[in-house]
């Protein structure tokens, strides 16, 4: 068992009851193009087209053969683009239940599948996009191979769902999914990472290795798992996938149908009844959160409060990789002499406010509690960084765009979510996730 001692479990109010409920019905879903790093779409549909569930919507020009399929049947009502015609979202009004079927197998056949059979079914169904690489966090090329595959069956993000609750209901599908993934590279390790105290289904597979992690966030991030088990570099790549996509893989191969359901956490200080709800990948979040939120101006986030995406306008949908929807209040109010008050209702990791010594949960808002200023190395980053890297030096190199120095200090192991806690504790109010992405893009472009 690997214990993570450095990090932070954010004391935020609105933790979800770990019981699965039906969510609000939604009649609109979307695929968010900007979730897929470096993707350039070649559209196969246009506005007004009627599509079936599992039908191809677009293909990645920069990654030939990787296709993106409809999570539901219906009519394409909008193809939203941003600056430089970047694809923001493809919106579907859900109608009917027509679907495309794919190859299916009995449970007994799964352990005899060839790598090519597994790959072909994943690609044709669009489930290949559930896999991501590290470094760079991109959908892998269909011709590439990984040193190993990581399955993340734990989640320590603030307000997250407990994976064991979800997996208890879909145990056979999860086991089937593990079996299928083990056949993708039979000679390479399949790492299943779970919480030390969790009881989740597994499978008796030759290349399956089970790892227990415990401790504070980011103990549940796949970047943490990769760092301690099979570190990556410029010449070494691993792939990873989350536990709900493993369930979808299991269902695809045994039913021949694309499975788009998600069980997510709907939680946060502004949610009336925080709980786990069933919904669909790409669900319209305005519809999903209707009558669920407290009065006032709220910010709905697809993902964690630490590193999720703001859900509004053409991005008002549940992300492909998001397993939670978090809602906090917009914090635009000015506080008279706020900096000089004891501030018993505010939290700080630096013990500068009275609230630090309280054991209560806090109603966090979007307020940054200060303006941007120079990066100040006072030990905050080291407090929340459990990986064997020098965070202050790495973050400095990221800020100035020193790609060589950043690589030497381990930036290739990281994704935006791995630096979310550094952004949270930063006295200078830097957003290190977006800075990291710029550096990673530059490294990949320049080789």
Curated annotation (Swiss-Prot):
Family according to the record: Belongs to the NqrA family.
EC number from the UniProt entry: 7.2.1.1
Keywords from the UniProt entry: Ion transport, NAD, Sodium, Sodium transport, Translocase, Transport, Ubiquinone
Catalyzed reaction equations: a ubiquinone + n Na(+)(in) + NADH + H(+) = a ubiquinol + n Na(+)(out) + NAD(+)
Cross-referenced NCBIfam families: nqrA (TIGR01936), PRK05352.1-2 (NF003759)
Chain's role: NQR complex catalyzes the reduction of ubiquinone-1 to ubiquinol by two successive reactions, coupled with the transport of Na(+) ions from the cytoplasm to the periplasm. NqrA to NqrE are probably involved in the second step, the conversion of ubisemiquinone to ubiquinol.
Stored HAMAP family: NqrA
TM stretches of this protein: none
Gene name linked to the record: nqrA
Magnesium listed as a keyword: no
Entry keyword Transferase: no
An annotated Gene Ontology molecular function: oxidoreductase activity, acting on NAD(P)H, quinone or similar compound as acceptor
Oligomer status and interactors: Composed of six subunits; NqrA, NqrB, NqrC, NqrD, NqrE and NqrF.
PANTHER family in the record: NA(+)-TRANSLOCATING NADH-QUINONE REDUCTASE SUBUNIT A
Protein name in the entry: Na(+)-translocating NADH-quinone reductase subunit A
Biological process, per Gene Ontology: sodium ion transport
Domain of life, per lineage: Bacteria
Source organism (scientific name): Haemophilus influenzae (strain ATCC 51907 / DSM 11121 / KW20 / Rd)
Alphabetized Gene3D superfamilies for the sequence: 2.40.50.100
